[in-house]
Amino acid sequence: MAGAWLRWGLLLWAGLLASSAHGRLRRITYVVHPGPGLAAGALPLSGPPRSRTFNVALNARYSRSSAAAGAPSRASPGVPSERTRRTSKPGGAALQGLRPPPPPPPEPARPAVPGGQLHPNPGGHPAAAPFTKQGRQVVRSKVPQETQSGGGSRLQVHQKQQLQGVNVCGGRCCHGWSKAPGSQRCTKPSCVPPCQNGGMCLRPQLCVCKPGTKGKACETIAAQDTSSPVFGGQSPGAASSWGPPEQAAKHTSSKKADTLPRVSPVAQMTLTLKPKPSVGLPQQIHSQVTPLSSQSVVIHHGQTQEYVLKPKYFPAQKGISGEQSTEGSFPLRYVQDQVAAPFQLSNHTGRIKVVFTPSICKVTCTKGSCQNSCEKGNTTTLISENGHAADTLTATNFRVVICHLPCMNGGQCSSRDKCQCPPNFTGKLCQIPVHGASVPKLYQHSQQPGKALGTHVIHSTHTLPLTVTSQQGVKVKFPPNIVNIHVKHPPEASVQIHQVSRIDGPTGQKTKEAQPGQSQVSYQGLPVQKTQTIHSTYSHQQVIPHVYPVAAKTQLGRCFQETIGSQCGKALPGLSKQEDCCGTVGTSWGFNKCQKCPKKPSYHGYNQMMECLPGYKRVNNTFCQDINECQLQGVCPNGECLNTMGSYRCTCKIGFGPDPTFSSCVPDPPVISEEKGPCYRLVSSGRQCMHPLSVHLTKQLCCCSVGKAWGPHCEKCPLPGTAAFKEICPGGMGYTVSGVHRRRPIHHHVGKGPVFVKPKNTQPVAKSTHPPPLPAKEEPVEALTFSREHGPGVAEPEVATAPPEKEIPSLDQEKTKLEPGQPQLSPGISTIHLHPQFPVVIEKTSPPVPVEVAPEASTSSASQVIAPTQVTEINECTVNPDICGAGHCINLPVRYTCICYEGYRFSEQQRKCVDIDECTQVQHLCSQGRCENTEGSFLCICPAGFMASEEGTNCIDVDECLRPDVCGEGHCVNTVGAFRCEYCDSGYRMTQRGRCEDIDECLNPSTCPDEQCVNSPGSYQCVPCTEGFRGWNGQCLDVDECLEPNVCANGDCSNLEGSYMCSCHKGYTRTPDHKHCRDIDECQQGNLCVNGQCKNTEGSFRCTCGQGYQLSAAKDQCEDIDECQHRHLCAHGQCRNTEGSFQCVCDQGYRASGLGDHCEDINECLEDKSVCQRGDCINTAGSYDCTCPDGFQLDDNKTCQDINECEHPGLCGPQGECLNTEGSFHCVCQQGFSISADGRTCEDIDECVNNTVCDSHGFCDNTAGSFRCLCYQGFQAPQDGQGCVDVNECELLSGVCGEAFCENVEGSFLCVCADENQEYSPMTGQCRSRTSTDLDVDVDQPKEEKKECYYNLNDASLCDNVLAPNVTKQECCCTSGVGWGDNCEIFPCPVLGTAEFTEMCPKGKGFVPAGESSSEAGGENYKDADECLLFGQEICKNGFCLNTRPGYECYCKQGTYYDPVKLQCFDMDECQDPSSCIDGQCVNTEGSYNCFCTHPMVLDASEKRCIRPAESNEQIEETDVYQDLCWEHLSDEYVCSRPLVGKQTTYTECCCLYGEAWGMQCALCPLKDSDDYAQLCNIPVTGRRQPYGRDALVDFSEQYTPEADPYFIQDRFLNSFEELQAEECGILNGCENGRCVRVQEGYTCDCFDGYHLDTAKMTCVDVNECDELNNRMSLCKNAKCINTDGSYKCLCLPGYVPSDKPNYCTPLNTALNLEKDSDLE
């Protein structure tokens, strides 16, 4: 904030530089030209300059340090120095530069003049020459006012010389631009009305305002407090001005200053407080001015003459947040006899206390989702060491520097009085630019602060006001006293500044005590709009650049106000820049596609980050400027927009009010239908409404809560965030509009912030506009309210914040607990409660109303202690909380008192808070308007031409000139309550209606005598006539070309406007320019002379026809000749004419001749060999006849077809198949059968008659159609089933002999060791020496191997039956294992009771060796094997294992049993026991079963028998289906709940469609993933039906099932027939292995795949695929087919192993070779 007005005050500040003389008094008069030019010699920017002359009288005490700091160069004594430099330009002169005077030579001491002078020159046109008088130089300069067009004369309307460059339209400067002086380029913008108050015209109709001013033309000075300042004995309405004491009376009585334009002069001065002034002060001022802090003051002379800090620009340094508002002002009051210490601009500022809290925030990312976590540290208080040293406070890992200097242009304050400047700036405040400078080494080093401190740190800057603690502990702000807090801290930490206050004065005395003999004046901050005690969190300190995604800043795009997901909506109608859109109302921006706006746009500064607050945009690296949102089209629909600082205001039209987002005006009130309808909680992808609520609701109640669709037509609810959603849910999700809430029909104001003008009928609420970027842990904040007397009976509240654990010890406090996110109290802001439906924050600044404090609430009363003997009164505040009405009740020892809200006062008669009539009690309220009192507030009713001020306390004039085109092309002059239009620009004239109208210069014929005159707004242009016209008196007349000879030969000429056209004769066509006729080549058209030849002629053509054609009557076509008119053509047929010829269509049996002119008979017997096959053909006239032999018959096509004798039933018998042959048949008998003697049947062959069929290794067993060989042990039947072959155990059992060589023998095998001195041990599978015993073990023998232990080797999936993966062979075989090995290479364990078992397990089953090996010396150390520990859950699955000695026990749950082979607890099927459910339907469940009885039978007491109740006499039909309640939910304790309402179902319907239990007995339904559920609900297991065939072969493995297609089970009510369960089906046993369906004829069974229907028994029986299909096709290749229930499986033959093909086994040798080949590859 300080940096902005210091830029404007540099020229004044330069004049205050000290010289080496001591005690000199110098008076210097400067002519100050307000403008943005800073450096000496800079040219002033465009705009209407208004000069002011200030006289500054300084009493400076020079010192050596100050003289050496920055004294300018000295001049020779007596030689006057040049102060100004004038340059001539059209229209007047302008001040180009201002140079500070050199210091004069030393002179004798002169009497000092007290104070300083600063006042504007009332003359307005000063003109004086420099003069020197007694060491006092006065420079006066006259700066005439420039014209609005830049000082030049008015531009000529018609310029002969064409301008070049940009902004040129039609040979002249575009509208809004003019020529720059001394050039022919249109580069000077024009602002109409001109920029006022020293503003700069940046581009047409865009003014860059000076600090402290605002508006479209900078015509409005920053808003000030309407309350009058108190100057000693002055009345509240008296005016005063800033100046030295002796000039105060003059300024008060002078009226010339009021006639001057409202320009805010900017000056920087140091007011020195003298102990004993030599000149007496006027009586109006009894106190002296206390010196300000090191920050300079921007003084705005407003109408109330109040001194306010009102920045338009503010320093955009990193870390600035909190409640400081650019809209806020700091009014100052002169208060007498206040106890405060004087503060001066020096290093003697006393001790300063800084209270801050460090926080450490980290980002944790898990699986692509990141979240912030912040941990707050302890609150730390630091106090500076002394007033002379730099204010550098140091804590652990933190370095805090307090700086009073406003370092500019990215400079950093390293100590109290030193700025470390960037490389391109210099000076004490880094205010002087340096051109072409290189980066010094010191600055290069400063860019890496981490290296200087030894660790990486972050530099943060916080600009905060300096407060002083008074006697009562109230924090008093000194608005001019603003300090910069520089904090260097680790990068992962952030700093929260709580308090920056002064402890004692410059001499060490405490601020609570006043020094005797001093009359002091203190500055006290009044409660102003949007200002409160600083309590902000500064986080996100890392310098991370945030840039816009579009590189070109001038690129225009569309601004979107809503962004939902990846969709952008609510676009403004016009185009805007990204920085204007994203800095104000936009959430996304783009042209072809939208891009989300960054959360906080940032730009790099020097060693810090510059961030602009919302509503502002960057001007340069150190300053941010307000964005005029009203320049964005459509920002205030249905309303008028007014720009404010950092925001804007919308005045809604009558009948409109603000929407919940405060971004537009919507019809007021919204029409919400009260119609009720069904509310649906879910909408499926097919747009079907589901899950309706039980009651009907309105659309608002439905869509604003849980509904997704509403109404009888399933209307989808609008998405949250859309305009349709806001219309029916203005309060957002979860809130509805009640009937009592209706907006008042007044003008509403909509904006980005709380800027509405409404009554103040509730407590003040503070609004935070800058939340911390990183989420922090929210903690409760205690709001402590204090009171400090400002005068008799006047108290002013202040709000301070402190941590919950640190309370301020005061007895007259009222402490209120505020949770995070709740509105906090702040003085000077009047709001209404935040209703969920209308979250509108209304603000207005009203005149200060005294807050009455009851005398009972003082400290003395509050500290009274009630004695134990006293009787306390009833607490009225507790009994009746609303006893005070609009106020807060405070109980007292006697009765109670009320602290009333703003706008109310306490009435002693009514004992409650009553409304204050501000209209009668407050003077000068609602000036220029009418005041209307309201409950708790008031309203200002403004007449036409006026509007309510931002504070809502006065009616201010509406500047109609700010509206575009209000005067057309003229100049608008605003008046009080109205406006008028003055002179017009060149090319325009004033109408009687007061508007500027364009002059049509083209009405004068002499304007363009030989050219065409084109009128344009404000100008005209002479344009040469185009071809076909000639110029005459400013018009272009047509030339008649048809009068010229040889025009349009072979055609007629028609004159046109500016041209002519030819109408050509027949046979000719116009050329493309329509000015000539040329011949048409008709032969190129393609549709002439068809079937002939076309020849083009001049203007026509000629046709020559071919054979069979003749010329048409029009002679343009060749017509066909109809030859069929001759009757003798085409005998035995019909004549058909064709193009150019004819065709004979002959009758059947005839064909056309070679020439096609007659019909001939066809001899079918010679030409068609396919006729009369297997017979004799006889040709006839036009046809033929066939004669067939025996065994054939003639068909309709006259072909001899074979007679199929196999169609006769019983032919070839059941063991044969009839095969039809040509003219006969043949019986094909099945294998094992032969044809009978007559050849019509098949007889069985007895293969066992031949004794050599099964040789000597088995015996023969004859079967029907075949035989089988029953082989002895060690032999097996081959694939063809004939004979018995030896089983090669060495190939079948891999590794059966271990390390020995396996030798196959007839019927058995031998294990032979390679060494003759060794013998094979079947126990260990190893070859051992014959001299050693099994117990002798070599010392070097390795430890016994550990492999996998297997169980249940008879299972097809035996490789998966692993008990334990790492056990010895004895641990496996001596316990529960049956096989031992690795990777399914299994060594079978010896059988219990054999010698091999005794050798391996000498102690018996259940005992294993105690050592690491089974061959310890002695072999006697054995222990009991803990099978439960050794095998874990595998030995007792689904049960509890208990080890015993020897062995173990497996305890299963009730209803289950233990399978010792599969080592698992399985469900016990109680339904196998007929006594479990007699005369009922038994349904097995996991661990239990259910017994269901058919209606009307019920269960008896034992629940195992269905009996008929004695009282029932109903006749029961077999087809009745029993229905009962269906329970939708079953708890973990098996308690049924939530019965299906309105419907009774069968057991199947309940379990398959609706619930989890059924019936009054709460019969449990099977689990959804169980086989019982699939069987109950008829869910196919295999998925789809498949036909038999080679492609339908399933895998040999039992676990293999073909991949099932996805299937969808429809709801029961959509099925064409109902699927019924056993108790509902009319068929016995309920179609087991199939589904029972109800058809019109009754019931039938739909069998599953693998079963077929036996119609005799009406049951589904298994299909034996191995018998019925294996004869037709080989189901198993090199494998044996084994039938299973509903399917079959293939088991590989010995010597074969499974392959990757289904049902195919490959030889073992081939498989091994393939594995070797794959290993080699």
From Swiss-Prot:
Pfam families: cEGF (PF12662), EGF_CA (PF07645), TB (PF00683). Contains hydroxylated asparagine residues. Isoform Short N-terminus is blocked. Residues 187-219, 399-431, 626-663, 873-910, 915-956, 957-997, 998-1037, 1038-1078, 1079-1119, 1120-1160, 1161-1201, 1202-1243, 1244-1281, 1286-1328, 1424-1466, 1467-1503, 1621-1657, 1662-1706 form the EGF-like domain. A motif (Cell attachment site) lies at residues 1174-1176. Residues 1507-1721 are annotated as: C-terminal domain. InterPro entries: cEGF, ECM_structural_protein, EGF-like_Ca-bd_dom, EGF-like_dom, EGF-type_Asp/Asn_hydroxyl_site, EGF_Ca-bd_CS, Growth_fac_rcpt_cys_sf, NOTCH1_EGF-like. Expressed in the aorta (at protein level). Isoform Long: Expressed in fibroblasts. Residues 1-23 form the signal peptide. Residues 64-81, 112-130 have a biased composition (Low complexity). Its main location: secreted. Keywords: Disease variant, Disulfide bond, EGF-like domain, Extracellular matrix, Glycoprotein, Growth factor binding, Hydroxylation, Phosphoprotein, Repeat, Secreted, Signal. It is found in: Secreted; Secreted, Extracellular space, Extracellular matrix. Gene3D superfamilies: Laminin, TGF-beta binding (TB) domain. GO terms for biological process: establishment of protein localization to extracellular region; sequestering of TGFbeta in extracellular matrix. The 8-Cys3 region in the third TB domain mediates the interchain disulfide bond interaction with the Latency-associated peptide chain (LAP) regulatory chain of TGFB1. This is Latent-transforming growth factor beta-binding protein 1. It comes from Homo sapiens (Human). The lineage of its organism: Eukaryota, Metazoa, Chordata, Craniata, Vertebrata. The gene is LTBP1.
